């Protein structure tokens, strides 16, 4: 059978409706974040300012993190040589898991190769092994959570986004004796809004449900030690399992879950996604360990990052640009049309040396295309002013209707 025509049509259709993804070839420069080298289609390298990185605190460039990674490579080499069960558990893994458990005030933690895998593994395993399990999932949960729930085979109930009343109604419709999990996020990555964690925990506790909180876009950034929104609001002890990433505010790579030792042991012992994969490299674990320890002890980066997020939002609002008024560090600038969003992004890069990736369907709904700006502690006022001026200039040239939209 000839498959090429089918595959070509899929690609052509994606190009036609603006879903086709092109990757900007960027080379990060140690010590110069958020500046990077962009290797353009003409083969030339050009210095650009990055405005959409998930390295929220610049920990990927932090001297302590880099030194820890170099030491680990010199000591242990590159890879682990096995799964966690077969020769692949390194001292760095054990120390990192203990540090993450402490970060969230939990008994235990378990690291994975990515945050996507940690959600897939934890939700997929718990939903599968709990008899007659029902999982209640926020309508805007991340793809990794959706896939984990789907993989579990558990019955899924979708509650309206950040709506404890609807969650309560759905939980009330289920047999009280059934095992139940409520899965939600703290900071939602595309809209930048924050979950009402206390209210959701109130509802879950009334119905005897476990709570599973994805803090991927909050760990490192909120709370006295960077434990996330649950840390900031003093709610970590009310959440059964807290999931996070090592690849955003901590600047390295990997994901994790933290919670009661018994639940972590069950996931460790029964998750295919944990059992049958090579463990993360020792130098990645060492770098993440250094990053977590640094963030716990040094609040300055997250304070400056929060200040810069407010500063940029004010500049965007004053310029009349359609930025959502979010309570978090994520600043969505709404465009509303896929091809226009991509054209603006390309013009910003080519004309103004500013890199902002367009966010189109299926990451967001059609008609909700946007840019997702993520200020860091290292963006300056000059960077911000240049971004606003470039957005206005490119917007005028391309006919972008920039009047502010209600959030």
From Swiss-Prot:
Its EC number is 2.3.1.37. Belongs to the class-II pyridoxal-phosphate-dependent aminotransferase family. Pyridoxal 5'-phosphate binds at residues 189, 217, 245, 277-278. CDD domains: KBL_like. The lineage of its organism: Bacteria, Pseudomonadati, Pseudomonadota, Alphaproteobacteria, Rhodobacterales. This is 5-aminolevulinate synthase 2. It catalyses: succinyl-CoA + glycine + H(+) = 5-aminolevulinate + CO2 + CoA. Pathway: Porphyrin-containing compound metabolism; protoporphyrin-IX biosynthesis; 5-aminolevulinate from glycine: step 1/1. Keywords: Acyltransferase, Heme biosynthesis, Pyridoxal phosphate, Transferase. One of its GO terms (biological process) is protoporphyrinogen IX biosynthetic process. Pfam families: Aminotran_1_2 (PF00155). The modification N6-(pyridoxal phosphate)lysine is found at residue 248. One of its GO terms (molecular function) is pyridoxal phosphate binding. Homodimer. Gene3D superfamilies: Aspartate Aminotransferase, domain 1, Type I PLP-dependent aspartate aminotransferase-like (Major domain). Substrate binds at residues 21, 137, 363. Its cofactor is pyridoxal 5'-phosphate. The keyword Transcription regulation does not apply. The active site is at residue 248. It comes from the Bacteria. The keyword Transferase applies. PROSITE patterns: AA_TRANSFER_CLASS_2.
């Amino acid at each position: 059978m000839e498959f090429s025509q089918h595959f070509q049509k899929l690609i052509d259709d994606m190009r036609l409706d603006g879903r086709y993804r092109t990757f900007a070839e960027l080379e990060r420069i140690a010590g110069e974040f958020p500046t990077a080298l962009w290797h353009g289609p003409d083969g030339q390298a050009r210095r650009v300012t990055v405005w959409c990185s998930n390295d929220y605190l610049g920990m990927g460039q932090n001297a302590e993190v880099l030194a820890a990674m170099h030491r680990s490579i010199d000591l242990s080499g590159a890879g682990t040589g096995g799964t966690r069960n077969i020769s692949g558990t390194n001292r760095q893994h054990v120390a990192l898991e203990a540090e993450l458990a402490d970060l969230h005030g939990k008994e235990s933690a378990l690291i994975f190769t990515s945050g996507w895998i940690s959600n897939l593994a934890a939700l997929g395993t718990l939903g599968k092994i709990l008899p007659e399990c029902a999982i209640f999932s926020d309508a805007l949960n991340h793809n990794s959570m959706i896939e984990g729930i789907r993989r579990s085979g558990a019955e899924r109930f979708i509650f309206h986004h950040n709506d404890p009343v609807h969650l309560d109604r759905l939980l009330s419709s289920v047999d009280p004796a059934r095992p139940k999990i409520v899965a939600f996020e703290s900071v939602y990555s595309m809209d930048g809004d924050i979950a009402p964690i206390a209210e959701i925990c109130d509802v879950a506790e009334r119905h005897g449900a476990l709570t599973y909180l994805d803090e991927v876009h909050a760990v490192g950034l909120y709370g006295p030690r960077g434990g996330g929104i649950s840390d900031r609001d003093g709610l970590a002890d009310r959440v059964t399992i807290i999931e996070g990433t090592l690849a955003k505010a901590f600047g390295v790579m990997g994901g994790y879950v933290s919670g009661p030792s018994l639940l972590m042991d069950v996931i460790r012992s029964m998750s295919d996604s944990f059992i049958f994969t090579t463990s993360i490299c020792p130098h990645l674990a060492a770098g993440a360990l250094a990053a977590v320890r640094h963030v716990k002890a040094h609040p300055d980066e997250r304070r400056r990052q929060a200040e810069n997020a407010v500063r940029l939002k004010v500049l965007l609002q004053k310029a009349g640009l359609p930025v959502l008024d979010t309570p978090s560090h994520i600043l969505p600038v709404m465009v509303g049309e896929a091809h226009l969003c991509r054209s603006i992004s390309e013009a910003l890069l080519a004309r103004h040396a500013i890199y902002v990736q367009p966010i189109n369907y299926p990451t967001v709904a059609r008609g909700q295309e946007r840019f997702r700006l993520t200020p860091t502690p290292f963006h300056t006022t000059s960077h911000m002013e240049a971004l606003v001026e470039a957005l206005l200039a490119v917007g005028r040239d391309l006919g972008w209707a920039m009047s502010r939209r209600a959030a």
